[in-house]
Amino acid sequence: MTDRKAAWERLRAWSEEPGVTAVLTDIDGTLAPIVPTPDMSEVPAELKEWLRRISERYLLVAGISGRKTEDALDLIGLDAVVYFGNHGFEILRDGEVEVIPEALPYLERVQELEGLARERLAPQGAFVEEKGITAS
């Protein structure tokens, strides 16, 4: 059996067991097209509807993003979806954003580096985005 055929067989089997299956997807570049600046990003309505429908079927549906978790929620806007932000450093749980404990020791240094990048690069036209536990 080819790798591709084996992968399709596994996917088919998982689709037949929705009560134990999670569907996880990246947001930017997968659900939302890549755009010049983050504020221009948008998840098409038909994909939001698709996420809503599959969230009713599968055990877990999650959106994963390099954005802040709140920004990922704003892009999709569905309470039934679990949101992981900042490349997995954050999770939206019960309406609250939690930063994973392993990331907390680095928070102060990330903020220092973000400030330094903004100070040195913004005057040259670079866009520096503060995202809490990360920066871009």
What are the language-model segments listed below?
Residues 1-27, 46:
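Non-catalytic pre-domain segments flanking phosphatase-related domains
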Residues 35-36:
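Active-site loop/short helix in cyclic nucleotide turnover domains
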Residues 42-133:
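Active-site phosphate-binding/coordination module
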